[in-house]
């Protein structure tokens, strides 16, 4: 059994990791840290885990993380890079759900996250954890930077088009919506029920920290210049993400051939569903699952292709993707512990 530790087990991605790993056939939950909740049984904070998780939260200095096989960091940015060197030296693998190991460009990281990077030497070996586009590197990795939720949808939605060279890569548009859980569990006025309920707004229009991450990865898929206009929105739901991606076609290609690009790219992917051309995927069709659904449109048969992408921001957009990476890193079936059917209604 793989001995797993979780640093930061009280946030939404932390409890989602607990939910997924509690029933994973190859995992033994060993340590869950929270300085504030030290000594509190996990099931007392999260009754949904009663009978499934019998651990108590422990302060980080008390947790025997170096005795684990892998440690997940479901923490604010900056925590993983402070602890990763010691864990790696002890032979422990690291999966960070924050941004510490996503960006190879240190200057971009420090600009957008407003903190210095304390172990830039580890960035060279850190694997970017978007499995469908980086599977081989993840298999061999000691440390993985889990992708952001928005970048996951943008990259998977645009990759087949960029790799085929059929769109103008310099003018990509991403219009993305996320549920409120994407903002985390911290107390914040903008996510209070009376503020977020019955409301819909854009944010980060002049610049968002997921833009440099997405651009860095998209540029690896094409030799062309890549430009991205990305606007995120907050919508009044708990879970779910819907990204509408626009690109101008530069090649004479029919709709069947466009569809074939995506079916060829993702036809064998267990967690990507390429829906029939012209479909309208709904966020609820992925709720509480590791599935991501994609559908293509071509308005008026013109030169614009529209890609619709939906996922659960806490699962494929965060914790589920991290578990998918863990499975690869330990030579397990990639789908282990992740074959949950989406919850409806």
UniProtKB/Swiss-Prot annotation:
Enzyme class: oxidoreductase
Pathway given in the UniProt record: Amino-acid biosynthesis; L-arginine biosynthesis; N(2)-acetyl-L-ornithine from L-glutamate: step 3/4
GO cellular component term, pick one: cytoplasm
Active site positions: 149
InterPro entries: AGPR_AS (IPR023013), AGPR_type-1 (IPR000706), NAD(P)-bd_dom_sf (IPR036291), NAGSA_dehydrogenase (IPR050085), Semialdehyde_DH_NAD-bd (IPR000534)
EC assignment: 1.2.1.38
PROSITE patterns recorded: ARGC
SUPFAM superfamilies associated with the record: Glyceraldehyde-3-phosphate dehydrogenase-like, C-terminal domain (SSF55347), NAD(P)-binding Rossmann-fold domains (SSF51735)
Main subcellular location of this protein, as a coarse class: cytoplasm
Record keywords, A-Z: Amino-acid biosynthesis, Arginine biosynthesis, Cytoplasm, NADP, Oxidoreductase
N-terminal signal peptide: none
Matching CDD domains: AGPR_1_C, AGPR_1_N
Gene Ontology MF annotations: N-acetyl-gamma-glutamyl-phosphate reductase activity; NAD binding; NADP+ binding
A matching Pfam family: Semialdhyde_dhC_1
Catalytic activity: N-acetyl-L-glutamate 5-semialdehyde + phosphate + NADP(+) = N-acetyl-L-glutamyl 5-phosphate + NADPH + H(+)
Subcellular locations according to the entry: Cytoplasm
Any GO BP: L-arginine biosynthetic process
Record keyword Oxidoreductase present: yes
Function of the protein: Catalyzes the NADPH-dependent reduction of N-acetyl-5-glutamyl phosphate to yield N-acetyl-L-glutamate 5-semialdehyde.
Family the UniProt entry places it in: Belongs to the NAGSA dehydrogenase family. Type 1 subfamily.
Protein name: N-acetyl-gamma-glutamyl-phosphate reductase
Organism of origin: Janthinobacterium sp. (strain Marseille) (Minibacterium massiliensis)
